[in-house]
């Protein structure tokens, strides 16, 4: 060995030690979840259909099982497919899976701040504050219930003024829902004809429309390339920035008129927290603006879309609408507004609402998670910071829990004796530590708005019911209802 020389021998020894250490590390960590072999830079783009990601994931799960790895471009993602594996991750190992995975489009829109997209101590502090403050302002209590009942009255009267003429109810619904979150966060509702309010809602609706454009769908695969190209994805980003600017103006106005002795709304409560804890870096004007944006967007789009989709489904199924009418008439009558205390006495109506949320499968991919530390799941090793897709669609469409899941059937949530049946598989708001902070508010809004509408009106389609299509328009983030018109006939 003398001919090799001492430096060469030492180098070989070092390389051998490094290889052994790497092997031991890999052996101790275990194997990572399997998946299709990615192509450098572009990942698994050819195995994934951007217009039907759920179909692609279903096929991959048949080959690789309920936990597998894909690559969006160079980004590695672990996909969880099915109730059991999602429960193991988000509930049984909730702390490890409590991170927020950020897709390129979400990062571009929200900058990793606020409640939805932040991580670590920032997320914990902001979420804790938001839940406490919303609860103090009446979330889940009578104060918020009364606000929704009042807004439902405005909505019913606005519908009544259409005089049975057919129209797309989308704007009416989003205006009403948006006003609830505005009253909580901004301190007051807007008039339905307020120009700033209408412009704001118009941008949100435009963003919904642009979600299924090819440029938007491909942004998560190739963000750097798409950033340099024109297209609707640029409008989507610009609209979000405009909404952000609108909220900043409101925040500034609140700061100028702030009175610590009389907090008016969520923004005032946040400003008060900033004043009390000036050394706390988690409570800043930027985090206030982003958290307010999160509450506004999340508190408007999901609920209004669920209501809009629900009315379309009822147009398709008049027999279901008629049963709801009879139950609401028997329990609530016509002389008072529906209230949350009625829900336990309206099992069929409650079942229909749950089935609407299950059937529409609004966020099939869920909002991405991430592991906050090296983690093992079913003997697979998942490195820290790996993005996780805990899919909701396979849970809400599980044929063992919900027979014939492709069929709209309130019986999925009814016992044989007609009482309401709860299901652990009902996860439209996700599960675990990252469950939607506004779940309680959304449930209340959907119930009170829908029952108020059906208490006062029957739904009349403008075309033959057999031609009504209740399949979704699939976008990059959500399932959306197809455009439709309806006549509201006073009862």
Swiss-Prot record:
One cellular component term from this protein's GO annotations in UniProt: cytoplasm
EC nos: 1.14.14.1
Name of the top EC class for this enzyme: oxidoreductase
Signal peptide bounds: none
Record flagged with keyword Transcription: no
Catalyzed chemical reaction(s): an organic molecule + reduced [NADPH--hemoprotein reductase] + O2 = an alcohol + oxidized [NADPH--hemoprotein reductase] + H2O + H(+)
Keywords noted in UniProt: Endoplasmic reticulum, Heme, Iron, Membrane, Metal-binding, Microsome, Monooxygenase, Oxidoreductase
Inducers of expression: By phenobarbital. Significantly increased expression by estrogen. Rapidly up-regulated within 0.5 hour after extrogen exposure with a peak at 1-4 hours. Expression is significantly decreased below control level after 30 hours.
Membrane topology: Peripheral membrane protein
Top-level taxon in the UniProt lineage: Eukaryota
Record-stated family: Belongs to the cytochrome P450 family.
Name of the protein this chain belongs to: Cytochrome P450 2H1
Source organism of the structure: Gallus gallus
Gene that this polypeptide is encoded by: CYP2H1
């Amino acid at each position: 060995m003398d001919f090799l020389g001492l430096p060469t021998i030492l180098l070989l020894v070092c390389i051998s030690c490094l290889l052994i250490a790497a092997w031991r590390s890999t052996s101790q960590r275990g194997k990572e979840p399997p998946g299709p072999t990615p192509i450098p830079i572009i990942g698994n783009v050819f195995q994934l259909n951007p217009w039907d990601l759920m179909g692609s994931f279903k096929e991959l799960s048949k080959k690789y099982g309920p936990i597998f790895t894909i690559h969006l471009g160079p980004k590695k993602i672990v996909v969880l497919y099915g109730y059991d594996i999602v429960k193991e991750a988000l509930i049984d190992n909730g702390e490890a899976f409590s991170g927020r995975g950020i897709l390129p489009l979400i990062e571009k829109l929200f900058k990793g701040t606020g409640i939805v997209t932040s991580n670590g101590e920032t997320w914990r502090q902001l979420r804790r504050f938001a839940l406490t403050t919303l609860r103090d302002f009446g979330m889940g209590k009578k104060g918020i219930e009364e606000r929704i009942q009042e807004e439902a009255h405005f909505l019913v009267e606005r519908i009544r003024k259409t005089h049975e003429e057919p129209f797309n109810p989308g704007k009416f619904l989003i205006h009403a829902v948006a006003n609830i979150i505005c009253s909580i966060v901004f301190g007051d509702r807007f008039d339905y004809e307020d120009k700033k309010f209408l412009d704001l809602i118009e941008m949100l609706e435009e963003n919904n429309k642009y979600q299924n454009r090819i440029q938007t769908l491909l942004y998560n695969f190739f963000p750097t390339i798409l950033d340099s190209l024109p297209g609707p994805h640029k409008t989507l980003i610009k609209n979000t920035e405009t909404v952000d600017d609108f909220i900043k103006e409101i925040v500034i106005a609140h700061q100028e008129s702030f009175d610590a002795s009389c907090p008016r709304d969520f923004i005032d409560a946040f400003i008060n927290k900033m004043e009390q804890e000036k050394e706390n870096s988690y409570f800043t004007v930027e985090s206030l603006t982003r958290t307010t944006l999160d509450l506004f967007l999340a508190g408007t789009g999901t609920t209004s879309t669920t209501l809009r989709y629900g009315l379309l489904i009822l147009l398709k199924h008049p027999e279901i609408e008629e049963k709801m009418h009879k139950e609401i008439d028997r329990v609530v009558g016509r002389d008072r507004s529906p209230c949350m205390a009625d829900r336990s006495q309206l099992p069929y109506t409650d079942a229909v609402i749950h089935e609407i949320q299950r059937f529409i499968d609004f966020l099939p991919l869920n909002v991405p998670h991430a592991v906050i530390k090296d983690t093992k799941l079913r003997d697979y090793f998942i490195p820290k910071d790996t993005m996780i897709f805990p899919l909701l669609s396979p849970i809400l469409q599980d044929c063992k829990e919900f027979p014939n899941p492709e069929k709209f059937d309130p019986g999925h949530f009814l016992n044989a004796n007609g009482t309401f049946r709860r299901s652990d598989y009902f996860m439209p708001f996700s599960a675990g530590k990252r469950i939607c902070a506004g779940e309680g508010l959304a449930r209340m809004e959907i119930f009170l708005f829908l029952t108020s509408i059906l208490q006062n009106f029957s739904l009349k389609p403008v075309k033959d019911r057999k031609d009504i299509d209740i399949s979704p328009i699939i976008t990059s983030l959500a399932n959306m209802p197809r455009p439709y018109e309806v006549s509201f006939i006073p009862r």
